[in-house]
A protein has these predicted regions:
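Terminal domain-start leader segments
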Residues: 1-49, 56, 75-79, 83-86, ...
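Structural motif
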Residues: 22-24, 51-53, 72, 92-97
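Short, glycine/charged-enriched secondary-structure capping and boundary segments
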Residues: 34-36, 64, 104-107
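Short, charged N-terminal beta->alpha structural module
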Residues: 55-58, 101
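A short, polar/proline- and glycine-enriched secondary-structure boundary/capping micro-motif
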Residues: 58-65
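Flexible, acidic/His-enriched mid-domain "rim/lid" segments that flank
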Residues: 73-178
Length: 178
């Protein structure tokens, strides 16, 4: 099965291109791992999840599709990896880095750092096409929602607060596996 990062890597232009994904929602999409810190470096033939000491152990347990590395200084780790893999062009998500972060990245890396909409467009296109597993999970979530709605209708009565109804609904769907 092709992983999400491999689908993204297949869009990279030949000749030393890589992508750096930093937004929390796209990091989670590519890795399946929720965290408030980290980034994903996508190369044509490899991918790395880079994070700090707070998340590295959990990341290594949960992320199987790419290598997880702990950094002390992100720019140093990125420089080492981009040099090792011969990266001459690094695409970053538009609007995800401060000007200072982008400037520091450009000063640290030997190749070009590009922050146009190209990477954002690729990520959006990948997320639009659902995998069989994503479709299965969407169907399961929809079935749980329908079940909860059907059952909660019997519980709703005058005098019940929204909070009571919300708690009962949560209990109903959690009992079913949500």
């Amino acid at each position: 099965m092709t992983t999400y990062w491999e689908r993204l890597a297949s869009r990279l232009p030949a000749g030393g291109s890589a992508a750096l994904v930093t937004s929390p929602h796209n990091r989670r999409y590519l890795t399946g791992f929720p965290s408030s810190d980290g980034c994903v470096l996508i190369l044509p033939d490899a991918a790395y999840f880079l994070t700090d000491f707070r998340y590295i152990e959990a990341a290594r347990r949960q992320i199987r599709s790419m290598e997880c590395l702990c950094y002390q200084r992100l720019t140093d780790t990125l420089r080492e990896l981009t040099e090792k893999h011969g990266v001459r062009r690094l695409l970053v998500e538009a609007g995800q880095m401060t000007l200072r972060e982008r400037r520091k990245l450009r000063e640290t890396l030997s190749g070009d750092v590009e922050d146009g909409d190209e990477l954002d467009d690729w990520l959006e296109a990948l997320r639009l096409i659902k995998s069989p597993d994503e479709l299965r999970r969407i169907r399961e979530a929809q079935a749980l929602t329908a079940y909860g709605f059907e059952k909660i209708l019997d519980y709703i009565r005058p005098g019940r607060t929204e909070r009571e109804i919300a708690l009962e609904l949560e209990f109903l769907i959690r009992r079913q596996g949500a």
